[in-house]
Every structure is written in C-alpha cells, then in structure tokens.
Amino acid sequence: MAVKIRLKRMGQIRAPFYRIVVADSRNKRDGRSIEEIGLYNPMTDPSTIEVKSERVQYWLGVGAQPTEQVAALLKVTGDWQKFKGLPGAEGTYRVPTANTKPPRIPGGGAAKAVEAPAEAPAEAETPASES
C-alpha cells in the first residue's frame, strides 16, 4: 500500500483551508484518510500552519511520501530538515503573536467611552472616603 501525506481540501467556496492527512494513494483527494496530522490555512495573514511533528516524523520514517505542496510546508516548519538530518531543523515558520493593540476606531469616540467608566468609579470612591 503506497501511503501519501497530502492536503485534503475543506471549507467553503473561495474560502479553502486544508487538513494535512496521511492517506492511501489510491483514495480520492477528499476521500478517506488514515490519520490527520496537521492543518494549513492560506487565507489568514500570515498563513497558519499547524503540524503534529511527532506523527509526521513517524509517517516519513515508515515510508510515506509527501506531495510537493506538503513537502514545501514541511520545509517551512522544519520537519523535513529534521527527518533528513539537515541543518535548519527549527524551520522558518514563526507563530503569529496576538495583537495586543486595541482596535482602531475612526473618531476615537468609543475608545474615550471605554476609558471614562474606568475613571468614574475611582472619583466616586474618593468623596466617599473623605466623609
């Protein structure tokens, strides 16, 4: 049985995301898979790549062949270099950090409204403690 590591298309029309799966090469693209080993979402900025590295190493070790697209993703995450014993096993993919800035609102009216209630309770406590 020839086993491939390939992309399984999911999502809606014009909004695809992919599961990285291990499947028999004779099965259809979106058909039955043996195991799901990752996710790839090209629609986010930057693209999201999640790979179960242990399972990828296992399947590559037992002879599963990645498709060209999956091989490119594995090179970005560093799993291909780790399997081949090449330098650069840390990969070039960086996990996107959470955006800590508050959303920018035109006019800034909502941002001021959020700050005003925070100041009001502090002022209300001061006169109460003086009495």
From Swiss-Prot:
Superkingdom of origin: Bacteria
Location of region: Disordered: 87-131
InterPro entries documented for this protein: Ribosomal_bS16, Ribosomal_bS16_dom_sf
Single Gene Ontology MF annotation: structural constituent of ribosome
Keywords, sorted A to Z: Ribonucleoprotein, Ribosomal protein
GO cellular component, one term: small ribosomal subunit
Extent of Low complexity compositional bias: 111-131
One Pfam family recorded for the sequence: Ribosomal_S16
GO BP, sorted A to Z: translation
Family: Belongs to the bacterial ribosomal protein bS16 family.
HAMAP family xrefs: Ribosomal_bS16 (MF_00385)
Protein name: Small ribosomal subunit protein bS16
Gene from which this protein is expressed: rpsP
